[in-house]
Amino acid sequence: GYKLADVYNQKITMDEFIAQLSDEDLMILFRGEGMCSPKVTPGTGSAFGGLTESLRAFGIPAACTTDGPSGLRLDCGTKAFSLPNGTALGCTFNLELVEKLYEMTGLELRKNRVDALLGPGLNIHRSPLNGRNFEYISEDPLLTGKMGAAQIIGLGIAGSTGTIKHFSTNNQEAHRHEVEAVVSVRALREIYFRGYEISVKEGQARSVMTTYGPMNGLWTSGNYDLNTIVLRKDWGFEGIVMSDWWAKANTEGEPSDMKNHAAMVMAQNDLFMVTSDASDQTQDNLVEALADGRITRGQLQRNARNILGFILKSPAMLYEMDMISEEELEDRKGDTEEDAAIDDIIYYESDEKGDVYIPGKDWDTQMGATIVFGINVESAEYDIEITARSPLGELSQLPITLYCDNVFKEMISFRGSQGEWFTDKREFGTLLGPSCHYIKIYFGATGLEIDNITLRYRKRVPGFDD
């Protein structure tokens, strides 16, 4: 069959390429995976595109996104620049400076193989109680739009892009999944849409994120007028629209439902973010909606065209076609040893009991060594068991430091065991899921041998998909 590179090289049209894809392939393309998918850069927000062997066989790469409005969020411990927040940028009134700053951020995205930043945030400052106002630029739609466009232009100079969010009227955090914004058309056009319109028309934004909540009766991820009429027909937008993470949608007159992905497909919200497994057809209503005619294959193909069109212009496609410059490849080789280890990270899955077993016999545990690994877990409280030994005497002190998602967890000081194996068990805490988390262990002394580490499932807690 044809490869996506054949579209890039203009040997075939995008429609000819998409015609090869099965209904199942099209549904999988609609679903992103995350957070921290092992199929893309460790510690990032989502993966989308070529997430299965079937899609990879068509030459579709997995593209990557990560937060956010204050710089790259890399939860595995990779260092990144912290940027001034959106309000601070707005206070400069300096478009040239902001554009240059985001050109540098675009280079950082390229270095970390991230295709789209999940920002800028363009919601209007409406209430001082909004806990995320710092991410947003101002109460002025013109300033907001101009600053958003400058960020997108800067990212584009470096060959990257951003995702303007949250479209639209996400102006408070309390009860944001349910609170309804009731707004007149004039207020929407003049205030709440204006920043997005400027960023699309002047900044050539290629990625938009919808909100969690409803606007005038419809949850925005399933709002056809918002995602198709206003965004694409009125403004000429040609990129992708994605949901916020684990967002709901509804059909007019019905309650919202996290499984109602058919409403998103119909509205041209191209990507649902996120799932733990994009190939799982039981997690939403797409199969039954296609069978009973609520959605059509043509609508799935339309969404796929948007997604693949975005990927064609992304760094992921350049890597897929081996078209990355020698300079960029050399720059990636300049990472620290710790960053290089993160690139080669190993992921461990939970078993049927919810436990995660991590073998440690091959680890380098010399003083100053660092081990990083990923774990895929459900939302639960966990204990941690460390089975180890040391040839040293009982008076020896052997400290290790545990980090989870780059946040300090605990320092444990073991004693020498004269070669005898022992198991240390203690509370580890709550891990939210379904998601991947990153564990880092720093060894503060030489002389400790690790046999294994086991995270023991204790009890379930509400997770991202509840």
State where each predicted segment sits.
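Edge beta-strands of extracellular beta-sandwich domains
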Residues: 450-455
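Solvent-exposed strand-to-loop "edge" motifs in beta-rich extracellular domains
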Residues: 112, 386-391, 444
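Extended, low-complexity, turn-rich repeat/linker tracts enriched in Gly/Pro/Ser/Thr and Asp/Glu
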Residues: 389-398, 447-448
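Glycoside hydrolase catalytic-domain context in secreted enzymes
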Residues: 1-370, 374-383, 399-421, 429-431, ...
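Short beta-strand-plus-loop segments that form exposed binding edges in beta-rich domains
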Residues: 440-448
